[in-house]
A protein has these predicted regions:
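Hydrophobic anchor at the beta1->P-loop junction of P-loop NTPases
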Residues: 20-22
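Conserved helicase motor core of SF1/SF2 NTP-dependent helicases
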Residues: 26, 211-287, 294-299, 551
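Conserved helicase C-terminal RecA-like lobe
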Residues: 151, 352, 382-606
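Long, highly charged, low-complexity intrinsically disordered interaction regions
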Residues: 341-400
Length: 606
């Protein structure tokens, strides 16, 4: 392997702490592999070396590259993830087994049960997922429960659920992935002799993607690295995009303070992208204030200029992009070398529907959220089901008081509901009979409307949107988040000619999504459709960043300066996935409302 000067300095580093700032496409994996080889070649025992990364796939790749470089089939060097290493330490001390680890499936099931028991009244999309993430945040950052304020539910409810979760976990002798870290830290603090044994075992520690480290992971690593502090960290503060998972970019920014005199090197040569892409991405990221200054350059060709394109709306945007994808494939660029990147996975939906319609093969990095599975969508589709003749008790109960009509569950006695029976139940209350007749009239009206007209009628004439606003206020949720679901549904309804046709389309769409989910693990065919979070570490010849608008990139929830900096880092990660061609697309209107291009577009061209 031929190294440039910066890479060589990193690979040849011997003892003491070192920070390697590795820009995109700068060969960081080669450097970590190379230094591991160099340590072993110089006489360091392979069993004394620990190489840590964040995913099993990355650890596997690192190990394979090391074995190939050394011409071996096995090694005593430990390659693993943080969770894997901490589990091995705990297993060795406490004789644990895999049965003590709470699997993701078990955790999901437990979250579902806890939400059903403690928070059944909260109808929020992704509540279980958000709850699991918040529990993880509390553990990762070691926040006292009384000082943590949940964003997804009232404080008392969150504390009740957290305590019930911990009680169940302890009674069943289970540890979740975050507990592995917390327990490992506790073990090292309470049993110095155990810590000393592992310090002697791992005398050289190399960490990949250091910008994504959490406070508790860093505390354990610092203990483990003592007393020699042979800690070799590799990362890029400009690519720190996982604060939502507990990562703290300031840990890397403060590394020189924690280790005064630590050696530093910048891998500033990009071997991946064209000169245009490197320059434009640098223009963007230089707008961040809290970062290490770097001058990334490339010896690659100039390439095509970074394209910035505006479209009337997301549907037109995707149709134009789909046509370009087809044309590029005809001209020799495989679909697998093209990627469509979005800020959120909800943003991927229009792309997926358009690619299905255009019969362009695609693959996904994320589990795509099903718009039609959202509780708001289910309510609207229930109204439409009733318009198509359904009279099931369960469906009436779902929408009876959305908006509030003060209808009692007791009024719906039979499995099949009739309006005559409802009128009879309330015969002594004229004002209730008026409400029932109005509901019957509304359902009849829906039968004569197009899907778009029907959604519009439910929103405004029936008063469902007002109900959603009141619900958001009562639950202290962002009103815009819920209204955007109604907007998405109305947009989806536009292209449908009949309610029956829309239901058939939804069924087909959901079936294809299930197939894609099954294929996700083994399939690597077609255009990549992904969020910016999930595409990190990957690269493609031709990349599109879509919906580059204010409120999307940067995301509407990013208000504070540090949140905007994280959004900019995310955009930077997206831009630097491209090898040869990069296109940034924005729209002029969304849901028939004018929207502004992202501020990031101005920063790219400055």
């Amino acid at each position: 392997m031929i190294y440039n000067n910066s890479q060589k300095k990193a690979v040849m580093h011997t003892t003491g702490p070192m920070m390697v700032l590795a820009g995109p496409g700068s060969g960081k994996t080669a450097v970590i592999t190379g230094r591991t080889c160099q340590l072993v070649t110089s006489g360091i025992s392979a069993s004394r070396i620990l190489v840590v990364t964040f995913t099993r796939a990355a650890a596997k790749e690192m190990k394979e590259r090391y074995l190939k470089a050394m011409g071996k089939t096995s090694t005593q060097v430990t390659f693993g993830t943080f969770h894997g290493v901490f589990y091995a330490i705990l297993r060795h001390t406490y004789r644990m087994s895999g049965n003590n680890i709470l699997s993701e499936e078990e955790k999901k099931r437990l979250m579902r049960e806890l939400v059903n028991h403690y928070a059944r009244d909260l109808e929020e999309e992704d509540l279980e997922e958000n709850l699991a993430r918040e529990i993880s945040t509390v553990k990762n950052n070691q926040i006292p429960l009384e000082h943590y304020y949940s964003a997804c539910m009232p404080q008392e409810k969150f504390r009740e659920i957290y305590e019930a979760y911990e009680k169940w976990r302890k009674e069943n002798k289970k540890l979740d992935f975050d507990d592995l870290m917390v327990q490992c830290k506790r073990l090292f603090l309470e049993r110095p002799e155990v810590l000393r044994a592992w310090q002697q075992k791992f005398q050289y520690i190399l960490i990949d993607e250091f910008q994504d480290i959490s406070p508790v992971q860093y505390e354990i690593v610092r203990m483990l690295a003592l007393p020699e502090n042979n800690l070799f960290i590799v990362g890029d503060d400009d690519q720190s995009i996982y604060q939502v998972r507990g990562a703290k970019p300031e840990i890397m920014l403060n590394f020189p303070k924690d280790y005064p005199g630590a050696a530093q090197v910048v891998l500033d040569k990009n071997y991946r992208s064209t000169e245009f892409i490197v320059k434009r991405s640098q223009c963007l990221i230089h707008h961040n204030k809290k970062r290490y200054e770097k001058a990334i350059s490339t010896d690659n060709e100039k390439g095509a200029p970074v394209a910035i394109r505006g479209y009337k709306n997301p549907r037109e945007e995707m149709r134009a992009v789909a046509e370009e994808l087809r044309e590029a494939e005809k001209n020799g660029c495989p679909y697998e070398e093209m990627a469509l990147l979005f800020r959120t996975n909800l943003g991927c939906r229009t792309a997926v529907e358009e690619l299905m319609e255009a019969q362009i093969p695609f693959q996904m990095r994320d589990a795509l959220p099903d718009l039609y599975d959202h509780w708001i969508a289910k309510d609207l589709l229930t109204y439409l089901n009733l318009a198509m003749g359904s009279r099931k008790r369960g469906e009436f109960l779902k929408i009876a008081n959305r908006p509030n009509r003060y209808l009692s569950r007791d009024a719906f006695e039979e499995a099949t509901v009739s309006f005559d029976a409802l009128l009879e139940y309330y015969e002594e209350k004229d004002w209730m009979c008026q409400r029932i007749r109005k509901l019957e009239q509304d359902i009849t009206t829906l039968t004569h409307l197009s899907p778009f007209g029907a959604v519009n009628y439910i929103r405004y004439a029936i008063g469902y949107e007002q109900y959603v606003k009141e619900y958001a206020a009562y639950r202290h949720l962002k009103e815009d988040d819920l209204i955007s679901v109604l907007d998405e549904l109305q947009e989806a309804a536009k292209s449908q000619k009949s309610i029956e046709g829309w239901f058939a389309h939804i069924e087909e769409y959901q079936q294809k999504m299930k197939e894609k989910q099954k294929q996700r693990a083994e399939s690597a065919e077609g255009v990549m459709v992904s969020t910016l979070h999930s595409v990190k570490g990957l690269e493609y010849d031709k990349v599109y960043l879509l919906d580059v608008n204010e409120g999307v990139m940067p995301y509407q929830k990013a208000v504070l300066a540090e949140a905007i900096e994280e959004e900019r880092r995310m955009f930077y990660v997206g831009m630097t996935r491209a090898r040869k061609e990069l296109t940034l697309c924005y729209v002029e209107e969304r849901f028939e409302k004018k929207v502004e291009p992202s501020r990031f577009l101005d920063e790219v061209i400055q």
